[in-house]
Amino acid sequence: MNLQTMIRTLQDYWSEQGCIMLQSYDVEKGAGTMSPYTFLKAIGPEPWKAGYVEPSRRPADGRYGENPNRLFQHHQFQVVMKPSPDNIQELYLGSLEKLGINPLEHDIRFVEDNWENPSLGCAGLGWEVWLDGMEITQFTYFQQVGGLECFPVTSEITYGVERLASYIQDKENVFDLEWTEGISYRDIFFQAEFENSTYAFETSNTDMLLTLFDTYEREATRQMQDGLVFPAYDYVLKCSHTFNLLDARGVVSVTERAQYIGRIRNLARRIAKTFYESREKLGFPLVKEEGGKRHE
């Protein structure tokens, strides 16, 4: 099964479970969780079921295309369901079966790995899912997003697209993966991986990046003053990516690192609170009569 077919199979399966299928969000981010389709939609009582592929940029993980499984940019297939179904783990195992992986014939383990994203004020109960000794998925029940307690709980399933495809195709090197017939992962992504790694570690203008972080922070704050959550959140994502670029260049000290993360977290918390309040003023329109409760 090539990678393109694998993604389509997951999309079809989760669509059958009631999830809407979205396209990736067009601002740089380090993980699918940071998309507003997860971060903002996990806030408040309104139900939400969605799936999407999210390119995720992690500058410090770039290896110029020389490492078989560490990348500047990888892909995640993200599934979020709120409220979390009681049978969410069974649904997940069903998705593996659709990919030709019979849980009865493989060693599938849920290894406790509670999750935290300090820069966005997020935390939850979590498990890594290991398939025959390889981590392929992160499974999380959100307890807190943007500093707000989550009720109802959102379940998040994050498939590592390249890792899962490597297992299915029995490839040791991600660049040898077949994306579709006649086209490899290398054909599509190798040059970008090499050039982005060069940029992240060698050629980025750190003075400019420092200025950009401050500029993005000010603009996020300014938009928040007008109650504009989504424009403000875009700039928080830009702050996060800019910080990651600075971190990759090694120009951020340990003390400064904590300060930068704190600045991003403060913005994210303000946005989460404002988003909740804005939906509350609208009467949480997606909540049905039997819907969820509000934050206490």
Swiss-Prot record:
Q: What class of enzyme is it?
A: ligase
Subcellular localization: Cytoplasm
Tell me which UniProt keywords the record has, alphabetically.
Aminoacyl-tRNA synthetase, ATP-binding, Cytoplasm, Ligase, Nucleotide-binding, Protein biosynthesis
Q: Identify the EC number(s).
A: 6.1.1.14
Domain of life from the UniProt record: Bacteria
Chief subcellular location: cytoplasm
What are its GO cellular component terms?
cytosol
Q: Which reaction does it catalyse?
A: tRNA(Gly) + glycine + ATP = glycyl-tRNA(Gly) + AMP + diphosphate
- Gene Ontology biological process terms from the UniProt entry: glycyl-tRNA aminoacylation
Q: Which is one GO molecular function term here?
A: catalytic activity, acting on a protein
InterPro entries noted in UniProt: aa-tRNA-synth_II/BPL/LPL (IPR045864), Gly-tRNA-synth_heterodimer (IPR006194), Gly-tRNA_ligase_asu (IPR002310)
The cross-references to SUPFAM superfamilies, in alphabetical order and at most eight, read: Class II aaRS and biotin synthetases
Family under the similarity heading: Belongs to the class-II aminoacyl-tRNA synthetase family.
What does the annotation say about its assembly with partners?
Tetramer of two alpha and two beta subunits.
Report the protein name in the record.
Glycine--tRNA ligase alpha subunit
Q: Please report the organism this UniProt entry assigns to the protein.
A: Listeria monocytogenes serotype 4b (strain CLIP80459)
What phylogenetic lineage does the species belong to? Bacteria, Bacillati, Bacillota, Bacilli, Bacillales
